[in-house]
Every structure is written in structure tokens, then in C-alpha cells.
Amino acid sequence: VAALAWQIDAFHGGRTMSALLQVSHLGKSFGGVKAVDGISFDLAPGELLALIGPNGAGKSTTFNMVNGQLNADQGSIMLQGQELVGRKPRDIWRQGVGRTFQIAETFASLTVVENVQMALLSHDDLLLSMWRRAADHRRDDALALLDQVGMKPQADRPCNVLAYGDVKRVELAIAMANDPKLLLMDEPTAGMAPKERNELMALTKDLVLQRGLAVLFTEHSMDVVFAYADRIIVLARGRLIAEGKPQDIRDHPQVQAVYFGTGKTFEKPSA
């Protein structure tokens, strides 16, 4: 496994120097109502950035503009100097962006390793209809990806017998098939027990360190956010209201007010 190639640079003027991803003045409206109103943020290699906010804050809209499912009305999304606004999700994937989904899905009739092989087949521009003739396509590479997520021992099991936490691990291996620079994770721990949540996020953290990934993730569990994010951006009513390290966000009065109203705070982590 390649060692971490980049280091997170220092902050300067609220922006990250040598950023992999640069989002600038991003905006999106629906029916004349601004869902996202001019937000800007950066993301560096080797960093996990959490995008959070209460319901209706604009985080899903922002996330879907970055992954290409929605077109921005204004602003820019630059990945290593390449504009992503207006690009289709497939083109963004080819640019080096991996993704996991809130509800993990695999081909239930295929084995664990075959699911990853299918992703590699697609990455290599081979038609999925060729699968029967290419059933051994890059099997060793698929097994190596599964080894990174702790699923190699279950490589030949059908996906429909896996526990949900293991399906999430397979999905993570699939997301690595295009050797991404940026990984987008939509509610990665949704529907998981606390132990499974921690295992998945610890694994993600390891992949960030091993591969030099940049990770942007949305998440409702504040325990997960505070435990695993290197930095957090908080949206409310389409605007970015706070940005900083977990402890700074935990103690931020405006963030506390948005989530709880006045007089309440986030629970402190147990010793």
C-alpha cells in the first residue's frame, strides 16, 4: 500500500493551501428559494471533512452538486484544477472521485470478489455485458482491495448472506476501484449499530492515511462526526455558518443554537 503522499497544509485566510478540492461561491435554488447560498470550502489530501447541518440546511444539495447529480446555478467546484460543474457523474468518477451511498447496495447474486471485479471492469471501459467472458478480470486486484477493507476472507461468499456492516465494507472496496483521489460518503453509518459505525469509520481513517485520500462525508450522528472528522463545516438555511476542528464546532454558540436552541450544548465525549 502506498504511503501517504501529501500532507495537510496550514490554513491561510480560512482556505486550505494546496487543496485537492476547492468549492467557491456555490449556489442552487429550487422554485426561487435558495437551497445553497454562496458557500465556499476546501478539502486537502489526507483529510476527512464532515458536512453537517439540521434538516433543510442544504448539505444534501451541496453534496449532490459535488458528485454531479445536481448542476450548480452559480459557483465553481474544482478538483485539482479541473472544473466539475456541468460534468456528469460518470465523468466525475473518471476524474478520480469515488462514492459510497446512504443505503449500500451490491449485486446480491454475485460473490464479494465478483462485485469488486465488476467495478474494475467498468473502470477499464469494458462493457458489463462482457462479464461472463471476463469472470476472472483482475481478480488479484479485487482481492487486494478486499484485503484493505478486511473482507478478503469472505471473497467467495455471495453478497446476499453478508451482515450489513460487511456490505458497507464491500461498498467501500468498490468505491476504491477507480483509485480515487477524493471519496464522497453519503451518511456512511446510517442504519448501523454503534460498534459497526466505529469500525467502518476507523477503517475509512486508515484508508485516508494509507492512500492519501481526501474524504467529504455527510453524517447525522454527531458522535461519529466529532470522533472521526478532522474538520467540520456547518450549514444552516443554505449558508455556511461555521467551519473548524471538532472541538471548535462542539463549543460554537451559533452551531449549538441551530441544533438545540438556546441553553443546550452537545454532550461531552466520555472519558
Which stretches of residues belong to each language-model region?
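Glycine-rich phosphate-binding loops of nucleotide-dependent enzymes
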Residues: 18-271
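Short, Lys/Arg-enriched N-terminal segments with co-localized hydrophobic residues
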Residues: 5-16
